[in-house]
């Protein structure tokens, strides 16, 4: 909470006490940690994974949606992210485990009669994973999109791809150029998406299946890749919740606005560099899928010490903004690297682990995973 916090959130002590958005003090998870050492903070930096399995993610053109625009088979969908790793030779670095502390994700749903419907699966991939986000065998980078009206691009089933060679990942600085380049991984503006040939089957299905208000929102951004900062006068006007405000924070189109494209009095950019299909910034497109896969069951009945890679748990007293406290449980997972669920592709050791990919699938209901730590040890 600060002077920048919208009034409707600042006064909503119930929401600020919700275990899946509240600040978490260091002492909740680490009660004996020394708070006096240099650089210490009073709250933990939490990795939050909010997954809404019935909602379309960016570039999801599945036509099987209901009248509200929700996917009709949520357990068959997935959501994930991937990152480069700075340490690649695990054997030399003596890295033997994936280790993390996770807050019980079923604090509220366990009180419901359909509690068993809230579980699913969490997967971790370590090794080589494809950087080709929109799979077409071509590297997309926003800064390659032309700003001079030239035709230095080609098309794939997803959209436009720049054809000029990569020199650097930096936006053009001429007036009006940002709107032409900060367009997301498909290289298309919203208006171009509305007319793009391979999107028409989806748009036809959406028009037939949804009500008018839902279709209007789909039509406004067919690829569903538009970015929205977590602050915004429109968010404030509708009194959006904390979780809702972050639903579009990772979308690529418009996430690096310049002053010409910012309608607020404050900076709304998520980043200042172009989105590229090159996670480790080596100017090449890695298309290999060679990795070890690890599986963790995220179900109430499987959160048991001694099973499912859980080695410890901690019941803590969580202070609440509305007053008082509630007991919550944190679980420590420690996954031996040698105990992978399966091996994909030609990988035989842990000497060149360049990427990590994590994803959730098999969920029927929304879920928020909160990680107090996430380490390779």
Locate each region found by the language model.
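Interaction/scaffold regions that mediate signaling and macromolecular assembly across diverse proteins
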Residues: 2-95, 101-377
